[in-house]
Every structure is written in structure tokens, then in C-alpha cells.
């Protein structure tokens, strides 16, 4: 599968960056997702999900069900993952807040909300057992599709700003 890396690695570096456990503690310890379509694998992920797809499963081509948490690859294919989240509807995607990109605007136009996280996520680099953490190279946000995703963020302890997109037709009114 192409484009499954979260960052383009330098010489001798890993290209895998995992969402830290503290993120899910702040999101809500009682929250369990039905699917993580971008999982590094059982035992390597902090995503509380009943079902996972790894890069070998190619989550982008699989059928999604239930509430989805998607920390997609941050390469060129991020827009494809956002489109899959939008088509599914009951999902949240943790992505860089790349407001200068076409994929970001396309994704946000289909979303129910966007939660811009305060600060930068301190991802786990390579393995949750690896103590090395890496700050993201940009700010992150959660793009939210569906009422359940919105409600989770509204009731979370995450710090940031929740914004609701304005429909293009209503923008001029």
C-alpha cells in the first residue's frame, strides 16, 4: 500500500508516529471507537478501538462501520483518507491543520466541525515502547463528521477551539 507513512523519514529514522495515550485520556477515557483504519497493529496503538486495519489490510479500501478514529498517513494521500471519512460520515480524523491545502478545504466543507488543538501533539515515534517522542511539525486538528464525533469533542478535556464550517451559500448572507 502506498502512502501509509505519517512523515517522510530522514536517513535512519522511522516513518511511524502514533497518537499518544494522553490524547485519548483527554478525549474521554470512556470512549471506545468501533474502528481504527490506520492502526500500527494490536499492542502498538493507544487508540481504543474494537477493530483495526493495519497497512497490510489497506484500511482505505476496506468497508468501515461504526464510529471511526482516523490518524491517517500524513503524506500525499491524506486527502483520500479525509474523503473516506467524509463518505463514511461517523468519524474523526486527526490531521495537520494545513489550511493552505486544497484537500483541507475540501474535507472541512464536508465536515460538521473542526477542532483546532492547542499546541502540538507529541506523537510517539516508531513504537509506543520507544520513549522518543516527536512534536508534530505543524499544529493539528480533528475534522469531525457526524453528531457522535461532535459530541465527543464537545464533552472532552482537549484544549482548543471548535469551529463549525459555514456553507458557501450562506457565507455571503
Predicted feature descriptions by range:
Residues 1-173:
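Class I S-adenosyl-L-methionine-dependent methyltransferase catalytic core
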Amino acid at each position: 500500500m502506498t502512502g501509509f507513512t505519517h512523515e517522510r523519514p530522514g536517513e535512519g529514522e522511522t516513518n511511524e508516529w502514533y497518537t499518544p495515550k494522553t490524547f485519548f485520556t483527554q478525549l474521554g477515557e470512556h470512549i471506545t471507537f468501533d474502528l481504527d483504519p490506520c492502526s500500527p497493529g494490536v499492542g502498538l496503538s493507544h487508540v481504543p478501538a474494537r477493530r483495526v486495519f493495519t497497512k497490510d489490510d489497506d484500511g482505505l479500501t476496506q468497508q468501515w462501520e461504526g464510529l471511526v478514529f482516523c490518524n491517517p498517513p500524513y503524506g500525499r494521500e491524506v486527502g483520500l483518507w479525509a474523503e473516506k471519512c467524509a463518505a463514511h460520515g461517523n468519524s474523526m480524523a486527526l490531521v495537520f491543520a494545513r489550511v493552505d491545502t486544497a484537500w483541507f478545504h475540501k474535507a472541512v466543507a464536508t465536515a460538521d466541525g473542526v477542532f483546532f488543538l492547542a499546541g502540538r501533539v507529541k506523537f510517539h515515534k516508531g513504537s509506543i515502547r520507544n520513549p522518543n517522542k516527536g512534536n508534530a511539525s505543524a499544529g493539528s486538528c480533528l475534522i469531525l463528521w457526524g453528531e457522535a464525533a461532535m459530541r465527543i469533542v464537545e464533552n472532552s478535556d482537549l484544549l482548543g477551539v471548535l469551529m463549525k464550517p459555514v456553507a458557501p451559500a450562506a457565507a455571503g448572507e
